[in-house]
Amino acid sequence: MDSFKVVLEGPAPWGFRLQGGKDFNVPLSISRLTPGGKAAQAGVAVGDWVLSIDGENAGSLTHIEAQNKIRACGERLSLGLSRAQPVQSKPQKASAPAADPPRYTFAPSVSLNKTARPFGAPPPADSAPQQNGQPLRPLVPDASKQRLMENTEDWRPRPGTGQSRSFRILAHLTGTEFMQDPDEEHLKKSSQVPRTEAPAPASSTPQEPWPGPTAPSPTSRPPWAVDPAFAERYAPDKTSTVLTRHSQPATPTPLQSRTSIVQAAAGGVPGGGSNNGKTPVCHQCHKVIRGRYLVALGHAYHPEEFVCSQCGKVLEEGGFFEEKGAIFCPPCYDVRYAPSCAKCKKKITGEIMHALKMTWHVHCFTCAACKTPIRNRAFYMEEGVPYCERDYEKMFGTKCHGCDFKIDAGDRFLEALGFSWHDTCFVCAICQINLEGKTFYSKKDRPLCKSHAFSHV
């Protein structure tokens, strides 16, 4: 591992992205670089571990704390980085082997560990193992690229039941990493690169057959690889696997009961029912209900005991009214509580008209002239009788003698010469001067001022 320090001159952006942190139990590292950015120009590489940020140890920082620390560095960012040395294979001297190298054959159901672990006999004591023939090239020549492939594993699309890398790290910390996802194992097997071993040179020396690899310890292999009956024991049709499925009721509620104001209960009742193991009790007779029942006003009833308080009619179907704790059918409610008409003194059971602080039948509150129901239109009262607007203007409307237009309510007017005038219409017929409150003369029912009293009109 090579440790070095990089100083980036601000301002942001710095041209790199972090991953990991104390909260992920993974050291902080560079996961992405912007091509041509400040970090790339300073020699930072993908996969470099971040040891310090602005002089502070990065090992104790969470991912968010590290981001905030970098944002706080305005004009100058100092990073302490560590880079792994690339793994290079060194060619070894070719020598005739004493025996053929062991060939490993893995059954399709055997799970491989994520990190390569030797099976069988331990490696020789020499730290540099001898190779025969052409040296094998490593699958990932750079350790930083290997870390990048592992760190970006969570970004690839995964099946719905696959485990993420963060979950596997947690499993490693809790000691449950051997429980590997079957879907993930299948994907790993399909993506493995087949490795071809160099053929060993023929040897004239007779060799004994290789006994095979030593079976690994049970703790390093998943249970479905060790136990051949694992798949059968945990099949979905076994009792150990519970499938929860939402089930619809066998018989739907009848449409007639749905549209009724009083509905037949399909589930439980307030305060008790099939949902909590209680039996419904009739609110009228206080007896346990066996069979069909009704729910109304928060209580359960026998269908034959939900009746009108006045006439005793069963209210199983149709509407009802509740007044002062008593239940009434619509006819009884209208007779008992419906208002009376101010004209005919009968109960109003249908459409009602409110006018003059009284209630009326619609057909009783009509115009005194045309006998048309007034309903929501404007009306005028004359001698205690209502008139529609059209008939009132025709019969009682006042017109100005000067302009021949109607004098509306609220208009200023005066009466002179036996006629009604708008205050602005009572003017001299010749000079048009206003004569309100002044002496005037009259000729041919037209007012004249003093100056034109003897003029011809």
Curated annotation (Swiss-Prot):
Residues the record lists as Asymmetric dimethylarginine modifications: R103
Modified residues (Phosphoserine): S78, S111, S247
Tissue expression per record: Isoform 1 and isoform 2 are expressed ubiquitously, however, isoform 2 predominates in skeletal muscle, isoform 1 is more abundant in lung, spleen, leukocytes and fetal liver.
An annotated GO BP: ossification
Family annotation (Gene3D superfamilies): 2.30.42.10, Cysteine Rich Protein
Single Gene Ontology MF annotation: muscle alpha-actinin binding
GO cellular component: actin cytoskeleton; adherens junction; cytosol; filamentous actin; focal adhesion; nucleoplasm; ruffle; stress fiber
The keyword Ribosomal protein appears for this protein: no
SMART domains listed in its UniProt record: LIM, PDZ
Subunit structure, interactors included: Binds via its LIM zinc-binding 3 domain (LIM 3) to endocytic codes of INSR, but not with those of IGF1R, LDLR, TFRC, or EGFR. Interacts with various PKC isoforms through the LIM zinc-binding domains. Binds to RET in a phosphorylation-independent manner via its LIM zinc-binding domain 2 (LIM 2). Probably part of a complex with SHC and the RET dimer. Interacts with TPM2. Interacts with TBX4 and TBX5.
UniProt-recorded name of the protein: PDZ and LIM domain protein 7
Gene source species: Homo sapiens (Human)
